[in-house]
Amino acid sequence: MKYNGDKVEGIKIAYIGGGSRGWAWRLMSDLALEQSLSGTVYLYDIDYEAAKTNEIIGNNLKSQWEYKSVDSMEEALKGADFVIISILPGTFNEMMSDVHTPEKFGIYQSVGDTTGPGGLFRALRTIPLYVEFANKIKKYCPEAWVINYTNPMALCVKTLYETFPKIKAFGCCHEVFSTQNLIAKAAKEIEGIECSREDIRTNVLGINHFTWIDKATYKNIDLIPVYKKFVEKYFESGYEDRGDWKESYFNSANKVKFDLFNKYGIIAAAGDRHLAEFIPFFGYLENPEAVAKWKFHLTPVSWRIKNREELIKKSKKMAKGEEKFEIEPSGEEGVKQMKALLGLGDLITNVNLPNRGQMEGVEFNTVVETNAFFTKDRVQPIISGKLPDTVNMLLSPHVLNQKMIFEAAIKKDKELVFHAFLNDPFVRKLTYSDAKKLFNEMFDNAREYLKGW
């Protein structure tokens, strides 16, 4: 890697999960648009053919980046300046169990990748992989900056740091961005203020997918009262800022978000599908009819399987030149973060990092999501303060479970992970006997990934 004026050339990016048909394509697009950076992206994936296809797609863009698929993680990592991780831990068969087995016991999960029974078992598959990633990063590129996109985000980042304490890693999630966009729309509709999400200053604090905003300003204007008026206007009907909520599993009318604002007076800053899973006792996920009433969706794994098949077809067409790869800004910030870390301009954005005091009221080393300051070769968390006690209480079981699930996965302690399972708000509605039955069934479904337990 070398600097040439205001450009950086010869950058090496290692991509673990380089066969991705989502995050990898977004990265390709953003890199092609950023003229100040150039280099090589090494694509590693357990599905080598998927990585090879992405190599062809990336090189067809004829950008300032070269893409190389490799069949060993070591080759990808050796001497890397940046490491990007976006993987599916296990297969959709396991995710089918994560999401749908609990439905036999009346537990409905809208995503199933972060919290709840599904999030827990996904974590048990993920943590051993991240121990391996951290150890190989330590060996082959200890000074690289590591960007994680995989869920469960908090436990992925925690595993990287617990395994390799000197790692330079952070986790990125776009959920807060959509809430900032919503605040900008509220400012326009209520006060006639034209602004983008980047123009708004927000204080972000919480844990991934259960993040909150307690301060939002545009110039000297406090936007919390503006958002309050917006919520009052749209609470009953909802506000469909991304189109008809019925048209996509990923759309909602923000009614969960609005309800939480009415209950707690601060802005819940994630999508309704994610927020609802942390607080199932509010009834948002009581049954499919309740979900429809709150105007969001349960996302069936069958849809993910069908969508994957469509993306595979799309990737083959793009590799053959039969379909055009659209180069457009993805809305993600990974490339902006790289630029800042390379010294090409500072950046403030929200990321997931171990708590070193940036968030009060949460145990040290818990992975929290707050704003951070990015500058050359440094990410400095920004003091975010403390959530109201009433909101912090909602976080508590999830913060404790983050610690217990990690410890159980490292020790392969089935009894401890069952206690974490019992502590999850979803599971508390069950009798002990039913909780044990559900746990054992899900454990058996995941046994291929739980050898030695």
UniProtKB/Swiss-Prot annotation:
List of catalytic residues: 174 (proton donor)
Gene3D superfamilies (UniProt xref): AglA-like glucosidase
Positions annotated to bind Mn(2+): 173, 209
Cofactor binding description: Binds 1 Mn(2+) ion per subunit.
Superkingdom classification of source: Bacteria
Enzyme class of the recorded protein, top EC level: hydrolase
Documented EC number(s): 3.2.1.67
InterPro entries, alphabetized: GH4_Enzyme_sf, Glyco_hydro_4, Glyco_hydro_4_C, Lactate_DH/Glyco_Ohase_4_C, NAD(P)-bd_dom_sf
Catalysed transformations (reactions): [(1->4)-alpha-D-galacturonosyl](n) + H2O = alpha-D-galacturonate + [(1->4)-alpha-D-galacturonosyl](n-1)
Residues engaged in binding NAD(+): 11-72
Chain positions recorded as substrate binding sites: 151
Family listed: Belongs to the glycosyl hydrolase 4 family.
Function: Alpha-galacturonidase able to catalyze the hydrolysis of the chromogenic substrate p-nitrophenyl-alpha-D-galacturonic acid (pNPalphaGalUA). It is probable that alpha-1,4-di-galacturonate (GalUA(2)) is the naturally occurring substrate.
Protein name, UniProt field: Alpha-galacturonidase
Native source species: Thermoanaerobacter italicus (strain DSM 9252 / Ab9)
Lineage: Bacteria, Bacillati, Bacillota, Clostridia, Thermoanaerobacterales
